[in-house]
């Protein structure tokens, strides 16, 4: 009869061996994962020059970008995946403390694996395009350089996240699997580039907003203070003014730029969003119609 540690070790090794054929190297210093016939998911920041995709058996094929979301750091490659099975997606959400395994094949080298725990959920970070990406999964699985784009799997070997980069605290951040990621991957696989919506305002930090309202004798209120409005932009056309305090988007309270970005991103497909602003002491409901800008992936203010 084996020890609990021995049984855990064997189980982890079995999961790694089962997922290994789906893990690929991308370019000179990245990784990816096969998610369908002819499709590989990786990070957008791995797309440099000609994209060589290296498989478990050593075969190298040239990948073509089906779709890329620079702001969201996600890309789908079209490549011959013959002989490499697609990794199954998890159908549930991971929990804090759950055991996960990070896998990679940095730059087409040997398979690398690390076992760790989910250490954080809903983490925000700056994407390669400089915009905020929200909702990341943080885990403690130790990974080598070049692991970005590789999969994070659960104890059943199912995909629960796509590694994107190391956090400043030594942990790794991953884009979590869920309905939103699946929809984004499907769209990118079809060659549909995401588009970002622009509100067209400059915002003061929440602390500044509270101090300014207090200074002019207005009651303190959580929200984002508009200190400049772009002429003829969506906010200007909707009637938002300098000094307005944005307190909700789509019925959800906003107290940070990240929450505003999330709300605007959710409204992107519809092309409009309902905002509530406080002007002085009055609450105003304002409907904003967005102008669509160049392909991107996250909302901007």
Feature map (PLM): residue ranges:
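Short, small/polar residue-rich loop motifs at catalytic or cofactor-binding pockets
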Residues: 27-29, 144-148, 223, 232-233, ...
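Conserved active-site neighborhood of the chymotrypsin/trypsin-like protease fold
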Residues: 2-4, 20-23, 28-112, 137, ...
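PDZ/PDZ-like domain micro-motif
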Residues: 146-152, 207-217, 230-248
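C-terminal cap/linker of serine protease catalytic domains
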Residues: 1-16, 102, 155, 159-221, ...
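Short, conserved beta-turn/loop elements at beta-strand boundaries and strand-helix junctions
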Residues: 37, 68-72, 119-127, 206-208
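Active-site region of chymotrypsin-like
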Residues: 20-22, 75, 79-88, 112-184, ...
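Conserved PDZ fold ligand-binding element
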Residues: 39-41, 160, 235-258
């Amino acid at each position: 009869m084996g020890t609990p540690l021995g049984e855990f070790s064997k189980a982890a090794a079995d999961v790694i061996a089962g997922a290994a054929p789906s893990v690929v190297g991308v370019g000179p210093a990245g990784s990816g994962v096969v998610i369908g016939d002819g499709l590989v998911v990786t990070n957008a920041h791995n797309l440099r020059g000609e994209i060589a995709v290296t498989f478990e058996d050593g075969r190298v094929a040239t990948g073509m970008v089906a779709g890329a979301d620079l702001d969201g750091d996600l890309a789908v490659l079209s490549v011959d995946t013959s002989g490499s099975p697609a990794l199954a997606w998890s159908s549930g959400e991971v929990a804090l403390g759950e055991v996960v395994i990070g896998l990679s094949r940095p730059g087409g080298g040997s398979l690398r694996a690390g076992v760790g725990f989910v250490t954080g959920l809903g983490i925000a970070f700056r994407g390669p395009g400089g915009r905020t990406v929200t909702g990341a999964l943080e885990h403690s699985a130790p990974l080598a350089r070049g692991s970005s784009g590789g999969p994070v799997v659960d104890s059943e070997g199912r995909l629960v996240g796509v590694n994107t980069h190391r956090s400043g605290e030594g942990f790794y951040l991953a884009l979590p699997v869920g309905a939103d990621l699946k929809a984004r991957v499907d769209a990118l696989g079809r060659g549909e580039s995401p588009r970002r919506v622009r509100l067209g305002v400059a915002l003061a930090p929440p602390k500044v907003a509270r101090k300014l309202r207090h200074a002019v004798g207005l009651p303190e209120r959580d929200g984002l203070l508009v200190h400049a409005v772009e002429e003829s932009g969506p906010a200007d056309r909707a009637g938002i003014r300098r000094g307005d305090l944005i307190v909700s988007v789509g019925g959800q309270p906003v107290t940070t730029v990240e929450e505003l970005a999330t709300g605007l991103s959710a409204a992107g497909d519809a092309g409009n969003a309902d905002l509530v602003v406080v002007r002085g002491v009055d609450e105003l409901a304002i409907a904003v119609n967005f102008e669509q800008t160049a392909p991107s992936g996250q909302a901007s203010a």
